[in-house]
Amino acid sequence: MSRRVRRGGLRVAVPKQETPVSKFLTASGTFQDDDIKLNHTGLRVVSSEPNLPTQTQSSSPDGQLSIADLELVRFLGKGAGGTVQLVRHKWTNVNYALKAIQMNINETVRKQIVQELKINQVTHQQCPYIVECFHSFYHNGVISMILEYMDRGSLSDIIKQQKQIPEPYLAVIASQVLKGLEYLHQVRHIIHRDIKPSNLLINHKGEVKISDFGVSAVLVHSLAQRDTFVGTCTYMSPERLQGRSYAYDSDLWSLGLTLLECALGTFPYKPAGMEEGWQNFFILMECIVNQPPAAASPDKFSPEFCSFIESCIRKCPSERPSTTDLLKHPFLQKYNEEEYHLSKIL
């Protein structure tokens, strides 16, 4: 079940409340959790994490962007704890994606939302390969994020429409995603931890951007590692599935699987006779951990593409190249981005 909250003429649909949010509210009605403070005017981060600003106040472009100035166009989708709607700014006719999260949700989802808020804040206007969050605020039990609208959907949508994405366009996609990951890894020391087709969004200009930072992690320094188990299991690297420590290179495994899925039109790992159900889910996980890595067939793909995928999907994390090294890979140099502009397949 869900309820609808009317906000300045805009009806925001949010999931049904499950747990009290009152313990996260200050006397003034500000939502406070961990090191963020969020109210109707915006977001403030007071962070002890070395790669996040000590104090930051979110602001809308030119002070013009507010919930009262947005009108609903249509419903886009829903996920854990929230809904996403396409909205239009009444005065500029610019479209945005409005993500609304009811904060009376379970602790795991709440922590993911808080983490997403912090990372959205630190990456604001910093990297053209990351979906931008223009404004976020809290009001009446709902956290709202006004996000850049990517009007061609996700790579997952493209696969459903096209079945397979031709290799030259995959090179263009890989280049843009790697530039986004290079920024996250080397500048912000962030592991995304959930790279997959549905989290890579595209717009009509052919721009590919990374989205959804709910399960991302900030590392203390470039050599640090994590050992928590979050993200979409089917795209996890073997070391993560085994519960071992992991670092930035786990994102590259996920990217390799994602690109191979786009090339094949189906998920690369699919044991014979696989059917839906938990038993077969664990068989799939065992296959990823214990069997040789998935690979691009040299009979169907160029040597450069096969080499690129092999570089990403190496079971030993230390053998995977960095984002910087992969950006120099012959596969990305083989195709001209202008000639294979993504708008041609959208």
Swiss-Prot record:
Residues 70-332 form the Protein kinase domain. The CERK1, MEKK1a/b, MKK1a/b/c and MPK4a/b proteins are involved in pathogen defense. The pathway induces rapid growth inhibition, cell wall depositions and accumulation of defense-related transcripts. This protein is required for full defense response to fungal pathogen chitin. One of its GO terms (biological process) is response to chitin. It comes from Physcomitrium patens. SMART domains: S_TKc. The active site is at 194 (proton acceptor). ATP binds at residues 76-84, 99. It catalyses: L-seryl-[protein] + ATP = O-phospho-L-seryl-[protein] + ADP + H(+); L-threonyl-[protein] + ATP = O-phospho-L-threonyl-[protein] + ADP + H(+); L-tyrosyl-[protein] + ATP = O-phospho-L-tyrosyl-[protein] + ADP + H(+). One of its GO terms (cellular component) is cytoplasm. InterPro entries: Kinase-like_dom_sf (IPR011009), Prot_kinase_dom (IPR000719), Protein_kinase_ATP_BS (IPR017441), Ser/Thr_kinase_AS (IPR008271). PANTHER family: DUAL SPECIFICITY MITOGEN-ACTIVATED PROTEIN KINASE KINASE 5-RELATED, MITOGEN-ACTIVATED PROTEIN KINASE KINASE 2-LIKE. This is Mitogen-activated protein kinase kinase 1c. PROSITE patterns: PROTEIN_KINASE_ATP, PROTEIN_KINASE_DOM, PROTEIN_KINASE_ST. Disruption phenotype: Slighty reduced chitin-induced cell wall modification compared to wild-type. Significantly reduced chitin-induced MPK phosphorylation. The levels of mRNAs of the defense-related PAL4 and CHS are being less induced following chitin treatment.
